């Protein structure tokens, strides 16, 4: 299989996608932890690997892969083991359609995640250090986003819109999951992996939209994926934000009340 290196952060959102994919495939790899709260993705040594300053980055036999969703499709097809990509052309189309929709709708969740979790973590740094770290971000767009997030300047309107978008999206997922156990059909695919990596924590992040009473099929889908051996094995390597997965798994009955938590 060759040498496999993954440069990424927690098993959370885009950063977690290749970790779940490699675990599902049973591929051994070297995990290079890039701490986003220390802005390590913008350090000169990392920018030599990925000039965009984003995570994740996969290196397989010297070839560099970026962009988390196509990266996971590469992982599925390049290595032996379980296939995450359907062979049937129509099912493959549906898989890619759902992956694209997840990537579009994850932007709203990113706003909430930054406001609730990452922003407070980053703001622990001295203002002068934070300003210096933001200044070295390669793109103007990302510099503005990090500045907004780190200064807690998302408006109430932005936050309300983000919550509404996430609520609409999870309701749409729930409607689909009322028809089949997974997003594409009866089998777990890359669409589920990508969606789970981004939306695994909704019962904690937006409980008003992601309760069992409101979206029971989504909650049952969460249970199915949390029970996959690759899922909890991946979260076992989390150091900070990803550890909340154990709290959620307990809250929905996947783990006993006193399971792993830190």
Give the predicted meaning of each segment.
Residues 1-139, 252-253, 261-262:
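GST-like domain detector, emphasizing the conserved glutathione-binding G-site
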Residues 106-223:
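GST-like fold's C-terminal all-alpha helical module
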Residues 9, 35, 190-192, 238-239:
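Short, solvent-exposed turn/loop segments enriched in Gly/Ser/Thr/Pro and often Arg
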Residues 212-262:
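Long, positively charged, glycine-interspersed low-complexity recognition regions
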Residues 39-40, 76, 195, 242-244:
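Short secondary-structure boundary/hinge segments and terminal tails
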Residues 76, 198-199, 235:
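Active-site-flanking alpha-helical
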Residues 76-80, 178, 226-227:
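Residues at helix-coil transition
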């Amino acid at each position: 299989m060759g040498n496999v290196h993954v440069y990424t952060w927690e098993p959370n959102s885009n950063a977690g996608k290749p970790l779940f994919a490699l675990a599902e495939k049973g591929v051994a790899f070297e995990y290079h932890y890039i701490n986003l709260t220390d802005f390590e993705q913008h350090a000169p040594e990392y920018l030599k690997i990925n000039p965009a300053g984003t995570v994740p980055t996969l290196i397989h036999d010297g070839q560099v892969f970026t962009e988390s969703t196509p990266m996971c499709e590469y992982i599925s097809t390049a290595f032996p083991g379980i296939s995450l990509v359907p062979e049937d052309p129509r099912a493959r189309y549906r898989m890619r359609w759902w992956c694209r929709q997840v990537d579009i709708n994850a932007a709203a969740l990113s706003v909430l995640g930054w406001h609730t979790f990452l922003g407070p973590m980053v703001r622990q740094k001295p203002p002068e250090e934070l300003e210096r770290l933001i200044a070295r971000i390669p793109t103007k767009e990302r510099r503005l986003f990090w500045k907004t997030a780190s200064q807690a300047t998302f408006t109430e309107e932005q936050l309300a819109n983000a919550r509404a978008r996430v609520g609409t999206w999870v309701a749409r997922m729930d409607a689909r999951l009322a028809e089949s156990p997974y997003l594409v059909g009866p089998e777990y695919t890359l669409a589920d992996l990508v969606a789970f990596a981004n939306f695994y924590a909704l019962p904690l992040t937006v409980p008003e939209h992601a309760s069992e009473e409101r979206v029971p099929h989504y909650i049952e889908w969460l249970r199915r994926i949390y029970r996959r051996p690759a899922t909890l094995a991946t979260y076992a390597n989390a150091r900070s934000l990803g550890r909340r997965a154990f709290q959620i798994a307990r809250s929905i009955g996947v783990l006993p009340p006193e399971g792993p938590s830190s």
